[in-house]
Amino acid sequence: MTLEYINKKRPSVSPELDPCSNSNYKDFQVSNTELDISVSFDKKIVSGQVTYKLTAKTPNTTSIVLDTSYLKIIKIRINGLPSDNYELVKRKEPFGSPLKISLPTTINKEFELNIEFSTTDKCTALQFIEKEATDGQTAPYLFSQCQAIHARSLFPCFDTPGIKSPYNMKVKSPYACLMSGRPKETNEEGVYCFHQPIPIPSYLVALASGDLASAPIGPRSTVYSERVGLSDCQWEFEKDMENFIQVAEGLIFKYEWLKFDALILPSSFPYGGMENPNITFATPTLISKDRSQVKVMAHELAHSWSGNLVTNCSWEHFWLNEGWTVYLERRIIGGIAAAEAKSLGEKEAAQYGEKRRHFSAIVGWNSLVDSVKTLDPKYTSLVWNLKEGSDPDDAFSRIPYEKGFNFLFYIEQQVGGIKEFDPFIPYYFKKFRYESLDTYQFIDVLYEFFEPRGKAAKLDAIDWKGWIFGEGLPPNIPQFDPSLADECYRLVDKWVDFAKSNSTDISGFNESRDIGNFEPDQHKLFLESLTEKFGAYSVSEQIIRKLPSIYPFYAASTNGEIKSSWNELLIRFGNYNTTDQIVQDFAMWLGTVGRMKFVRPGYKLLQAYVSKEFAISTFTKFESSYHPICKTMVKKDLSLI
């Protein structure tokens, strides 16, 4: 019955139109894009030209409309001839200023559109960093972040995941450059060239420039960073990268992008990782010196298929990128765990790999529950409605990741488990390779694959309406294997019992005995679960203030996940004020990281449990060091805009 509801919601044509683009991308086919740019660190701009090879899909197309945001348009040429017949339409937030270019009536086949442009100081895709603020302090630094709708502030484009193109990229800079393509040899000093033969959308165009050095981390992988931190980066990733690729290839199909490299960016990078093709951009918080955060690289690798080869047609269907990627990431992590267990002679290695996958899913489920509690309900559905002019950055959360994963996990279980579901994985990615799709097409291909295998009734039984458009938690609560989580839960229960007993004798707790054998994710689960349980029970601040002396490991940890969870536990329930060292240290830490996963909850924590004035003054102190995207989102969180 709910499938009938879905069919009534279907657009007349799939994939449906992207409401976050001002462009008329549906009217054109792009066979190639040439991006030729120069970086000025003095002026803090990128300038140059973009050349498109375009074919109108209908003969009566009279204009082309591209997305721009805070760009300066210098000159336009059509088939080499200058054109003044264009208009930069008045800006409309948050989608920028459409660039409308009239086409000559003589154009009836493929044509070339060339646009000279320059970014401005309002560009939201770029962050320039003074050399004094870099780790090495030897050169300034520049990096881009175009997802979701920020490519339009870097160059005029069809800024939507709904259309793709191969790219040739050329950049001139006084410092080494990386872009989201395969490097090409060039004899020009200070000029760097890249080729991306696989069609990609605009949000995957990436640029970085600075004092970059590199080191091998596998036969198909290189890590780049500032020279000063290179050896730490190499150690963090060299053990796992090739293993990740091989497990992923066994699950899906051969890696098509040739190289899977990574760039560890300065601390202001606002995300954990960004899956730019051939060169994943990653936060330095991954360099935890215990390899515990390397799973983020498994996630970014999975994007090489989910997101980069097969792409959501618009940000309303973002779960198709991220839900699939989390699903593949956990299969990769489980596969690695099984292989390691087998190498140690474990008889039930495959089962252990599944336990690892389920443990990761439990941690993810907890983050989903937390997200549902704090988000605007309209952003907790699997498919968003952004048709009223909503900024996709406002909708960003763990929902598409974790609700999307749980939807796929539920479908996997519904059709009979891994053995039945696994053949669908390569089928899906081959069918939509190089294309963009919506959720309706995903449902269609599920039936296309499983109906001939006698599974149509299983799919019919799915609450499609509840899963796809329902707000809050999904309609079906997953059943995960709790084996690796039980140890964490037992310690949580012990603390809750102690808190309820009103005892002051803490001798029953000991760091080595309690948490000494925990793996990094178990630390995170323990801290988050303890925070949740203490939130339901009025724990005394005296107990909270004893925790640092019992578990000094947490205070000393360099793992961002642990540090964030630990400080939430202390500050929420410890009744600390602005002068307490716990609060001061946490506030200073917020100034050293730019990853929004930590920064945004951090300021919300200070605002709610210390003081709004202190949160704002701390943010003001560090505001200039944050990326434009992060800066805007924190301002919204603190009601500053």
Curated annotation (Swiss-Prot):
Catalytic activity: an epoxide + H2O = an ethanediol
Residue numbers annotated as active site: 300, 401
Cofactor note: Binds 1 zinc ion per subunit.
GO biological process: peptide catabolic process; proteolysis
Alphabetical UniProt keywords: Cytoplasm, Hydrolase, Metal-binding, Metalloprotease, Nucleus, Protease, Zinc
GO CC terms in record: cytosol; nucleus
Compartments where located: Cytoplasm; Nucleus
Annotated positions binding a peptide: 145-147, 270-275
Residues that bind Zn(2+): 299, 303, 322
InterPro entries on file: Aminopeptidase_N-like_N, Aminopeptidase_N-like_N_sf, ARM-type_fold, LTA4H, LTA4H_cat, M1_LTA-4_hydro/amino_C_sf, M1_LTA4H, Peptidase_M1
Main location, first listed in the record: cytoplasm
GO molecular function: aminopeptidase activity; epoxide hydrolase activity; metallopeptidase activity; zinc ion binding
Keyword presence, Zinc: yes
Superkingdom as given in the UniProt entry: Eukaryota
Entry-linked Pfam families: Leuk-A4-hydro_C, Peptidase_M1, Peptidase_M1_N
Cofactor(s) of this protein: Zn(2+)
Family: Belongs to the peptidase M1 family.
PANTHER family: LEUKOTRIENE A-4 HYDROLASE
Descriptive protein name: Leucine aminopeptidase 2
Organism, scientific name: Debaryomyces hansenii (strain ATCC 36239 / CBS 767 / BCRC 21394 / JCM 1990 / NBRC 0083 / IGC 2968)
